[in-house]
Every structure is written in C-alpha cells, then in structure tokens.
Amino acid sequence: TYAGTVFRRQDDEESRPNEYTQVGYEMFDRAEPISADAEVFALITQALGAAPVKAATGDIGILVAAVSALETSEARKGALLRHIWRPQKFRALLEQFSTPSVARDVLGLDNPFENAGPEIGLRRTSDVKDRLDELRADAQITPISKTVVDLLDALLNIRAMLPLAVAQLWDLAVEMPAIGPAVERLGARMIALKTRGVDIEKIEFATSYGRSLMEYYDGFVFGFYAETRTDLPPIATGGRYDALTKQLGQGAEIPAVGGVIRPDLLLDLEGAA
C-alpha cells in the first residue's frame, strides 16, 4: 500500500488538477493471479464503502487473444496490437487490412530512385528501399475477411452485467476459439469476486473498457464512477500490468495487479450526499 501526491499532465481537460493525492494497493503474485485480481478489486470496493459509485470492468487480454490469432501477417497483427489502446487508430488499421491493397505506382518502378535528388534528413536511400520492400510484401497479403471483421466488431460491442457478458463471450468463442482461455480466466475471476462477497450482478463488463485508460494495463482493468456526478473522473481505477513489469525488469517479470483511489473525489461525493 502507499499514499502520496501524483503529478499528471492534463492535455485535454485543463480544468482537471495536475496534482492530487492518490492511495494505492499493489499485489505481485505468481501463484494465483486470478485470486489477486479479485482481492484488489474487493479491497477497493470495501474501501469505497457506501459511496454512490458504479463499477465498470474490462479485460484487455480478450482482445489481445483475438488479434493474436488473426490469419494475417505478423506485421499487421503487430500493428493492431500496438494500437489496441488507441481505438480510432485500431479501427482505421482494421479497415485498411480488410480492404484489398491498391498498388502504389512507385512500387512497380524498376528504379524508384531514378532522378531523385540528394539525400536530406535522417532516412537514407537504404531505409527507403527497405520500406518499399515492406510495402510490396504487404500488398500481396490477403485481406482480413468481412466475417472476421464482423466477429471482432461483435466482440468489441459486448457490454453487459458481468454474468451475462461472460455468457455472451462464451457464445462468441464458438466462432473465435482463440479467446476461449481468456474468457475462461474471466469466468474464474467472476467466481473469485463472488467468493469475496462482491455483488457480481452490479458489475458492468465491456470488452472495450480500458482501451483509452493507461496503456500499460494488459489484462483485467476496472474503474469506479460517481453515479450522480458524470463530470468527475474515475473515483478509483486499477488493473493488471504484467507486461510493464517485464519491460521495467528488462526481461525479469512478475505478474502484477493494483488499484488506486482518489480521496479528494471520494470526499466530494460524501459531502454531496
């Protein structure tokens, strides 16, 4: 556990403070990550007490599993995976990769550098040649089928209370078997939450939830929002960030999950109640 001052740049909403107090709880557990997810969520729920908030959850791992199993090039899958946390860019790439490529004139030239001027900037002729080779290879790739795009859309559009969402995901897993293990983990997490006294019927789940939050969340993700103050940012947030520990540890990783509460926002809610 920890408590301290957080400094955060606000690019889009200048009215939000750049500095505020945050209280957090983190767990590092190799043995039972699902249990750790449930424990962190349950403790945050308990700490919020009777505050008028509603819970929203997601699981980035489900979409990661779906994208990783696409029958397309590794380069295209890599691009989609990098932009999971940028929904608009992800959508643009998905549309691009599901449309037959239009060969650019320059790709068909025997010598695209004929009559070229002097090299300017950091990119050398060899870099441009490599990029042209990549574009030629990409132009030969079979587009992602409309059926697969429709399945991804159906996956991203799932939004319901947790038990119903799990059922809907299992139905979709019939056509998308690659998401099965991730959905199984979600179901196990739901049971673990219920075991800890959390009312799972009041937890909303959306496959897309968390894609515009912190990019380092790569699995379970959650947030608590004021029911009557839609102008406020999340009162509490959290999630799993296994990949971040691997990045920071330079290959030495440990499964990690945590959550934070904004005491100032919680006091605002209690004062308004």
Residue ranges of predicted features:
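Short, conserved phosphate-binding/catalytic loop or strand-edge motifs used
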Residues: E19-G24, T57-A66
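Short coil/turn segments at secondary-structure boundaries
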Residues: T1-Y2, G78, Q96, F205
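Acidic, His- and aromatic-enriched active-site or binding-groove loops in soluble protein domains
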Residues: T72-V102, A226-E227
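Positively charged, Gly/Ser-enriched RNA/tRNA-binding surfaces
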Residues: Y2-V53, D105-A273
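Short, well-ordered alpha-helical segments in soluble proteins
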Residues: L48, L70-E71, Q88, L193
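A generic structural motif
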Residues: A55-D59, H83, T207
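A short acidic (Asp/Glu
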Residues: V64-A69, Y217
